[in-house]
């Protein structure tokens, strides 16, 4: 049997059965589920998919912000031989129509958009209803718990959906998992170019496996350590860490109720691992600078060796980084001043580089090998070179299978196993990459 994230999930359910795996927000506070409970949820969803004739190669679109059912559906689709297709919770009706149609999704999960600000027209179920009749390949639309207000022949509630799996034996799920290979597609992630419709990047179980293991050269986390899920799961970074890395390392993941609340959530949870983008670190940077500049004693404390440790702890706690052992920034350039300040405070934020087409990461700085102003050195097992025109090329086991149903576009960027990134960069004598 190929090594896959669903098979690792079942291992966790045995090894860490009663250990916390997932904490989701509710009106009464956090609801925490163990690895055994998460695995049972995934298997219930997998049974239901099989009961709806979801077969090898079929696609499940997930149109929602981060939630338990998103993770569960994604892993369940993979468990039974299919693939997950993330749809941004903020996507317009036209964008949803393209992704769901182009991916040939058989089933669609519809959930919440916490950024709708009370505007029902921006909620996923209403936007999907605008285009549902054009989605002829969609056989079933499943409303996640708490979602309603719409009617259509293809719709079903969550409880009705789960009921479709009542007669499916657990042995059937194990048979499906046993038939998986590392070359099987596990996800389609849609990425926008400068022109035309988004392209579906086809990533395999092997792509994700390599990426998860390769990260160990820079950081290693252990069962039970805390992580905050806030990046939209339709994004490759969120999908990699919040699904595959979470399960592989057995992290305790806390889910944000809204991506706008991530800073406050980090302060509450004090995660060991944090994944962000420059705008989040810019906000943290502004808070730290204000604290330093606004209080003379803090400015003195940061300069005096006897006091610096005390004030560093205060500032790390205020930013939600008291327990943080590694934080990553990527997706866009970051001001080097931000990295230098945080690193001087003992907050290990490092810049990396990658793209959807290489399963998120290709280079990374880390404590033992860090050069601010660069995006670090390549992952072990990854090759990178600069073409004659300055374009960066990447080769390795994390490079995509191709663009789904778009051989022309695939041939433009994959040549002799090299991925043409479209980014201009340099590689210095020590192997550090600069974009």
Language model regions located:
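Adenylate-forming
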Residues: 65, 110-129, 271-341, 351-358, ...
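Conserved AMP-binding/adenylate-forming core of the ANL superfamily
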Residues: 2, 18, 22-75, 92-97, ...
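Conserved ATP-binding/catalytic segment of the ANL
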Residues: 52, 378-435
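Conserved AMP-binding/adenylation subdomain of ANL enzymes
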Residues: 81, 209-226, 233-314, 323, ...
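Conserved AMP-binding A3 loop
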Residues: 32-36, 186-212
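A short helix-loop-beta submotif of the ANL/AMP-binding
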Residues: 58-59, 65-93, 98-107, 225-226, ...
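Structural core segment of the AMP-binding/adenylate-forming
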Residues: 10, 79-163
